Amino acid sequence: MIHPETNLDVADNSGARQVQCIKVLGGSKRKTASVGDVIVVSVKEAIPRGKVKKGDVHQAVIVRTSYPVRRADGSAIRFDRNAAVLINKQQEPIGTRIFGPVVRELRARKFMKIISLAPEVL
């Protein structure tokens, strides 16, 4: 579960290393986000000469959470750290590579570009 002010790792090569959630999109009273949800983030740490820089505000889709994600078959999957992929206004990833595994739930949310770039889909 991702709340506003939660810090997340960035799982792509957009140039950002750490981001902080500013807002959970999808309703005026929505407080938490899970895997596959879109959030608004601020870049807190970035590498030199990256596509994004510190202080930039972007949208991001959550690809890994430490809070367990329940599946229809009763199983659950969770990760050690929270991670997100930065996306543009057209819901396409800013980076050209994805690092680490992503969850299968992204396919139902129509993030096919992220699924195809990921090295592993769990």
Curated annotation (Swiss-Prot):
GO terms for biological process: translation. It holds the Pfam family Ribosomal_L14. GO terms for molecular function: large ribosomal subunit rRNA binding; structural constituent of ribosome. It comes from the Bacteria. GO terms for cellular component: cytosolic large ribosomal subunit. Keywords: Ribonucleoprotein, Ribosomal protein, RNA-binding, rRNA-binding. The keyword Membrane does not apply. Binds to 23S rRNA. Forms part of two intersubunit bridges in the 70S ribosome. Part of the 50S ribosomal subunit. Forms a cluster with proteins L3 and L19. In the 70S ribosome, L14 and L19 interact and together make contacts with the 16S rRNA in bridges B5 and B8. HAMAP family: Ribosomal_uL14 (MF_01367). Belongs to the universal ribosomal protein uL14 family. This is Large ribosomal subunit protein uL14. It comes from Gluconacetobacter diazotrophicus (strain ATCC 49037 / DSM 5601 / CCUG 37298 / CIP 103539 / LMG 7603 / PAl5).
